[in-house]
Amino acid sequence: MAPKGGPKQQSEEDLLLQDFSRNLSAKSSALFFGNAFIVSAIPIWLYWRIWHMDLIQSAVLYSVMTLVSTYLVAFAYKNVKFVLKHKVAQKREDAVSKEVTRKLSEADNRKMSRKEKDERILWKKNEVADYEATTFSIFYNNTLFLVLVIVASFFILKNFNPTVNYILSISASSGLIALLSTGSK
């Protein structure tokens, strides 16, 4: 069965579906993996300076654990963003609608169809929701990861060998935030 609309309608539907899919744009992926790499590398300083793990001798361990942690933290970013985006969009809908309507001048308002106004409002709402969900996801997961690393390193695993402490605290912290991100609340 052929699509009912023309190519314009098909592309609009594709854009709308893209806004609600779990797939990330290349820009979002780069942002997530860049941030995840930075936050995953921060504990290296902690273990190098405080736990006295040599940088050169532990370089392979640091590299492997940082890459594993980077993947898990980026996974958590993506999941939290997806869950939050719809909630933020619902909460910001009225404010965004008022803002877009106010920005349209009276002349534009008469020339524009109701459907086109609704599309602009929907596009702006998705843009705002995407931005807010992305920034909150990064903030929330970074904070949780670093707190978990510090608690695990200095309190739970303090009597372990520094190498074992590093492996367990990084893997447990990144694994826990990845696990918590799969929840739907």
Curated annotation (Swiss-Prot):
Subcellular location, record wording: Endoplasmic reticulum membrane
Keyword Acetylation belongs to the record: yes
Location of N-acetylmethionine modifications: 1
Keyword line: Acetylation, Endoplasmic reticulum, Membrane, Phosphoprotein, Transmembrane, Transmembrane helix
Residue spans, topological domain Lumenal: 1-27, 77-135
GO annotation terms (biological process): SRP-dependent cotranslational protein targeting to membrane
Residues with the Phosphoserine modification: 11, 105
Gene Ontology terms: cellular component: endoplasmic reticulum; endoplasmic reticulum membrane
Topology feature Cytoplasmic, residues: 49-54, 158-163
Transmembrane intervals: 28-48, 55-76, 136-157, 164-184
Topology in membrane: Multi-pass membrane protein
The protein's assembly and partners: Heterotetramer of TRAP-alpha, TRAP-beta, TRAP-delta and TRAP-gamma.
Homology family: Belongs to the TRAP-gamma family.
Functional summary from the UniProt entry: TRAP proteins are part of a complex whose function is to bind calcium to the ER membrane and thereby regulate the retention of ER resident proteins.
Name the UniProt record assigns to this protein: Translocon-associated protein subunit gamma
Naturally occurring in which organism (per UniProt): Bos taurus (Bovine)
Chain's gene name: SSR3
